[in-house]
């Protein structure tokens, strides 16, 4: 028989850096979940990912205070900034203030990484989504 779900928590946790400090500790503590058990399991699950990479995580908490979690791919904005080698996107939008450049191949690479979390199964459509995100961040996409 399936366990009863008490709730879901959405958190952005850096890969390999889960600790009992806020926001993880306070969020899980309110639900009376074993914080250290989550931190150990999360850090073990993300040890192959570059440390410090922000990862959207969905934690499912059951009535008996046990939990499961799903780690999603890093946000598109993080990957775009990483490929463009910039710290921050533009405060202005689109063509007003270009802060960096990425190639169409970079967009395709990011789209391949993000495919499980995007609402499309087509790589061309996924690439267009990533290009749109880059443009809204003030990062120019060059190439075809």
UniProtKB/Swiss-Prot annotation:
Superkingdom of this protein's organism: Bacteria
Keyword rRNA-binding: yes
GO BP of this protein: translation
InterPro entries named in the record: Ribosomal_uL11, Ribosomal_uL11_bac-typ, Ribosomal_uL11_C, Ribosomal_uL11_C_sf, Ribosomal_uL11_CS, Ribosomal_uL11_N, Ribosomal_uL11_N_sf
Entries under Pfam families matching the protein: Ribosomal_L11, Ribosomal_L11_N
Cystine pairs: none
GO cellular component: cytosolic large ribosomal subunit
Post-translational modification: One or more lysine residues are methylated.
Molecular functions (GO terms): large ribosomal subunit rRNA binding; structural constituent of ribosome
Keywords, in A-Z order: Methylation, Ribonucleoprotein, Ribosomal protein, RNA-binding, rRNA-binding
Family statement: Belongs to the universal ribosomal protein uL11 family.
Subunit structure, as described in the record: Part of the ribosomal stalk of the 50S ribosomal subunit. Interacts with L10 and the large rRNA to form the base of the stalk. L10 forms an elongated spine to which L12 dimers bind in a sequential fashion forming a multimeric L10(L12)X complex.
Function of the molecule: Forms part of the ribosomal stalk which helps the ribosome interact with GTP-bound translation factors.
Protein name, per record: Large ribosomal subunit protein uL11
Species of origin: Rickettsia bellii (strain OSU 85-389)
Species classification: Bacteria, Pseudomonadati, Pseudomonadota, Alphaproteobacteria, Rickettsiales
Gene: rplK
